[in-house]
Amino acid sequence: MARTLFLLALTLPGLVHAQPSRLNCRDGVDAPPRLFPVQNVWGLAQYPSRDAEWSEERKVQEIAKAGFDAFDVWAGGASDADFARWIALGKKHGIEVGVETEVLKPEDFAPAVAAAKRLGSVYLDAHVGTSFTSEADAEALLRGLVEHCRSAGVPLVIQTHRGRVTQDLLRSVAYAKAVPDLRFDLDLSHYFVAGEIGGPLGPDAEAAFAILMERAIMLDARLSNGEQVQVDHRNPAYAAQRDRFAAMWKRTMKDWLRTAARGDVFPFRIELGPPDYAILGPDGREISDRWEQQKDLRSLVIRLWNEAVSETGAGEPYRR
């Protein structure tokens, strides 16, 4: 029955449509649509090791030196001192600040928007609800958040994540149908591991992902092999998965470029997590250098973006 309802949802009119540019992220610069690479500070947690973790300033310094346009912070529960420190770090290192936070109830709408405005973020990335939020409550929460952000003039992206209302493809497609202005920060890795997708996509998954890719105005870079949520894309053993993710990322970029307008930016965030996202060896150390992975992912993302620009004839190549 569930599969029948899912296939019916995929055929309903109006489910897939090009996103209007007014919902895209913008940074106020009058320029062709362009890429906006972001590195999550959390991606450097416990780096280079749990016992010798870089300071927050060192992390931001390294992120700026690597050529990212912004560093991303978790703003939920942040203090005035946190906001002041992040703003100062951004100014000192010539880099912008992106905002990620949690929305569990309508009372969370205003603080989330205030955080994005305070930090001047080009997006508000929201982790919405939990895996136990009912479909009806989730839809109401998403609809309310979309309306609140539209009124406030803040570009909203809903992160696709395990343990949230977007934890599975079936429900995420249903929300996309129910809330036409819903836009996603699409992290494919969570869907691949939640659905144990280790090989080529089946027709149901292909159809569902196509919907979410058309609705994505931001992407997260993490590679899953269908069993682990995070594996090293440089490992030849995962070449097929790397190529599959790269193709899906580029397709999403091309979908976005076809309707983007001047001043629009496409955030692509790198955020490889510390253990237990990262895999540990017998010596208790990560089996791969996570920062080197993330810098290499940035290079891959830029190559894919420039290919998408060339193939669509839209947007601006990324040259930084």
Residue map of PLM features:
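N-terminal pre-domain/capping segments
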Residues: 19-117, 121, 299-320
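Alpha-helical scaffolding segments of alpha/beta enzyme cores, especially the outer helices
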Residues: 58-62, 81-88, 92, 111-118, ...
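Sec-dependent N-terminal signal peptides
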Residues: 4-12
